[in-house]
Amino acid sequence: MVEDELALFDKSINEFWNKFKSTVSDTSCQMVGLRETYKDSIKAFAEKLSVKLKEEERMVEMFLEYQNQICRQNKLIQEKKENLLKLIAEVKDKKQEVEALTANIQDLKEEYARKKETISTANKANEERLKRLQKSADLYKDRLGLEIRKIYGDKLQFIFTDIDPKHPDRPFMFSLCLNEARDYEVSDCAPRLECLAEFQEKVRQTNNFSAFLANVRKAFTALVYN
């Protein structure tokens, strides 16, 4: 009876041991499998993380490069803006210079027109006075033996003859012109007359040219008889 119980107990012990070893063996295999799975998961995660980090680095590099490009563009835009402002200032200065030059040209044109009008008026007056001189000369040519010639420098040369009875063709002459003040100016008198300056001043005051010619002829005649 006791032997049977011992045999049964021994059998139970053996069954428990075998079952325990089987359970431990299965658990060990499961642990090894889990460990390998864990390693693979960690490796895959590390690879994914590495790829992600590299992508992040590229993104950072791209961002920095883009930021640098923006800085360069902003600098270039600022330089162009400064150049444009400088150009605008130069254009304004040139415009002011052109306006001043245009105004100056207009003033010169107006001054030229005034001077031209003054010269034209003076020339007309000069022509009228020369016409009067010529008319007076023509009137007295026969009576005074007077010949008038136009010579260099817009001068008129007055030549008297029939003064010296011994030499009727002997010339007595002087030259006449209008100076810048449009006054009579006598020169080149031959023979020389001391009173010529007085006659010149008188004709300037009276504008009586006929009397001037008569006085000059009388003065030449006085030289012959004195």
Swiss-Prot record:
<feature type="coiled-coil region">
    <location>
        <begin position="72"/>
        <end position="147"/>
    </location>
</feature>
<feature type="region of interest" description="Interaction with the NDC80-NUF2 subcomplex">
    <location>
        <begin position="1"/>
        <end position="58"/>
    </location>
</feature>
<feature type="region of interest" description="Interaction with the C-terminus of SPBC24">
    <location>
        <begin position="147"/>
        <end position="226"/>
    </location>
</feature>
<dbReference type="GO" id="GO:0031262">
    <property type="term" value="C:Ndc80 complex"/>
</dbReference>
<dbReference type="InterPro" id="IPR045143">
    <property type="entry name" value="Spc25"/>
</dbReference>
<dbReference type="InterPro" id="IPR013255">
    <property type="entry name" value="Spc25_C"/>
</dbReference>
<dbReference type="GO" id="GO:0007052">
    <property type="term" value="P:mitotic spindle organization"/>
</dbReference>
<dbReference type="GO" id="GO:0008608">
    <property type="term" value="P:attachment of spindle microtubules to kinetochore"/>
</dbReference>
<dbReference type="GO" id="GO:0005634">
    <property type="term" value="C:nucleus"/>
</dbReference>
<keyword id="KW-0539">Nucleus</keyword>
<comment type="function">
    <text>Acts as a component of the essential kinetochore-associated NDC80 complex, which is required for chromosome segregation and spindle checkpoint activity. Required for kinetochore integrity and the organization of stable microtubule binding sites in the outer plate of the kinetochore. The NDC80 complex synergistically enhances the affinity of the SKA1 complex for microtubules and may allow the NDC80 complex to track depolymerizing microtubules.</text>
</comment>
<comment type="similarity">
    <text>Belongs to the SPC25 family.</text>
</comment>
<dbReference type="GO" id="GO:0051301">
    <property type="term" value="P:cell division"/>
</dbReference>
<feature type="modified residue" description="Phosphoserine">
    <location>
        <position position="12"/>
    </location>
</feature>
<protein>
    <recommendedName>
        <fullName>Kinetochore protein Spc25</fullName>
    </recommendedName>
</protein>
<dbReference type="Pfam" id="PF08234">
    <property type="entry name" value="Spindle_Spc25"/>
</dbReference>
<feature type="region of interest" description="Interaction with the N-terminus of SPBC24">
    <location>
        <begin position="1"/>
        <end position="146"/>
    </location>
</feature>
<dbReference type="GO" id="GO:0007059">
    <property type="term" value="P:chromosome segregation"/>
</dbReference>
<keyword id="KW-0498">Mitosis</keyword>
<keyword id="KW-0137">Centromere</keyword>
<dbReference type="GO" id="GO:0005829">
    <property type="term" value="C:cytosol"/>
</dbReference>
<keyword id="KW-0995">Kinetochore</keyword>
<keyword id="KW-0175">Coiled coil</keyword>
<keyword id="KW-0597">Phosphoprotein</keyword>
<comment type="subunit">
    <text>Component of the NDC80 complex, which consists of NDC80/HEC1, CDCA1, SPBC24 and SPBC25. The NDC80 complex is formed by two subcomplexes composed of NDC80/HEC1-CDCA1 and SPBC24-SPBC25. Each subcomplex is formed by parallel interactions through the coiled-coil domains of individual subunits. Formation of a tetrameric complex is mediated by interactions between the C-terminal regions of both subunits of the NDC80/HEC1-CDCA1 subcomplex and the N-terminal regions of both subunits of the SPBC24-SPBC25 complex.</text>
</comment>
<dbReference type="GO" id="GO:0000776">
    <property type="term" value="C:kinetochore"/>
</dbReference>
<keyword id="KW-0131">Cell cycle</keyword>
<keyword id="KW-0158">Chromosome</keyword>
<keyword id="KW-0132">Cell division</keyword>
